[in-house]
Amino acid sequence: MIITSERISLKHLLTAEALTDREVMGLIRRAGEFKQGAKWHPEERQYFATNLFFENSTRTHKSFEVAEKKLGLEVIEFEASRSSVQKGETLYDTVLTMSAIGVDVAVIRHGKENYYDELIQSKTIQCSIINGGDGSGQHPTQCLLDLMTIYEEFGGFEGLKVAIVGDITHSRVAKSNMQLLNRLGAEIYFSGPEEWYDHQFDVYGQYVPLDEIVEKVDVMMLLRVQHERHDGKESFSKEGYHLEYGLTNERATRLQKHAIIMHPAPVNRDVELADELVESLQSRIVAQMSNGVFMRMAILEAILHGKA
């Protein structure tokens, strides 16, 4: 049975924390409907979407593309390496162009934090913006698909014990997740190299050694070591990191039977978690990827519903 959810309308999706609890739950339920086979196709007019990715991406980029095509949108292709960006065109002018030619929604990933500020302040740019990741800032669509995956497993968030482990300071996924999970009633634990942890995050949870929480958590959320944001200054070997901060096979045996393993991917196998655990029975990494399509369908629908 498909349960009908309240329709959500959004102008933009820039940060996770800007969403209300009603919007979060509405998007989760609508994504679940899409997963069960619900259909939506634009009526009366054609809608155009474009994916402007200035940082490398597989999952976010391609799952948005699949989501757009499942919804019947016209997808305007864009490759930064073959665009006027190579001639010095700014992000603002690229988006201005897309808006001028009739694009309704632009999914953007960019290395600059808060890149979207000047775009949404523009009186000329009319297209909606979905943040596909801004530097080390936010990744709201990844957060929402993570919440969907957790909700499918546990039916709620109140009282869940969630460990966020790894390169927390550099992780936009961690920032978005800690904000919403904390607000929805989950109990957050942070772990990983202390030099990769900022104590400003203490408002959302507590920092503890990994071995103190392995047996306690319901969700083990591991983060990719972001080598590209360390300028080659990591102080750990891959083997050393895995033994001290990774989910080893030995640590995995200490997880509760109902606990799930999550990772936003790409996974550095045998670094953040043991190779054998990526597709293990407790892993939900593949489910996260699959849910990404349905959640992004729900987000796109909410954006276009706001334009109707």
Swiss-Prot record:
A single GO molecular function term of this UniProt record: amino acid binding
Cellular component aspect of the GO annotation: cytosol
Organism: Enterococcus faecalis (strain ATCC 700802 / V583)
Name of the protein in its database record: Aspartate carbamoyltransferase catalytic subunit
Reactions catalysed, as given in the entry: carbamoyl phosphate + L-aspartate = N-carbamoyl-L-aspartate + phosphate + H(+)
Stored PANTHER family: ASPARTATE CARBAMOYLTRANSFERASE, ORNITHINE CARBAMOYLTRANSFERASE, MITOCHONDRIAL
The EC number(s) this enzyme carries: 2.1.3.2
Top-level taxon in the UniProt lineage: Bacteria
Entry's Gene Ontology BP terms: 'de novo' pyrimidine nucleobase biosynthetic process; 'de novo' UMP biosynthetic process; amino acid metabolic process
Cross-referenced NCBIfam families: asp_carb_tr, PRK00856.1
Pathway the protein contributes to: Pyrimidine metabolism; UMP biosynthesis via de novo pathway; (S)-dihydroorotate from bicarbonate: step 2/3
Top EC category: transferase
Keywords: Pyrimidine biosynthesis, Transferase
Oligomer status and interactors: Heterododecamer (2C3:3R2) of six catalytic PyrB chains organized as two trimers (C3), and six regulatory PyrI chains organized as three dimers (R2).
Purpose: Catalyzes the condensation of carbamoyl phosphate and aspartate to form carbamoyl aspartate and inorganic phosphate, the committed step in the de novo pyrimidine nucleotide biosynthesis pathway.
Binding positions for carbamoyl phosphate per the UniProt entry: 59-60, 109, 139, 142, 265-266
Binding-site positions, L-aspartate: 87, 172, 224
Family: Belongs to the aspartate/ornithine carbamoyltransferase superfamily. ATCase family.
The gene coding this protein: pyrB
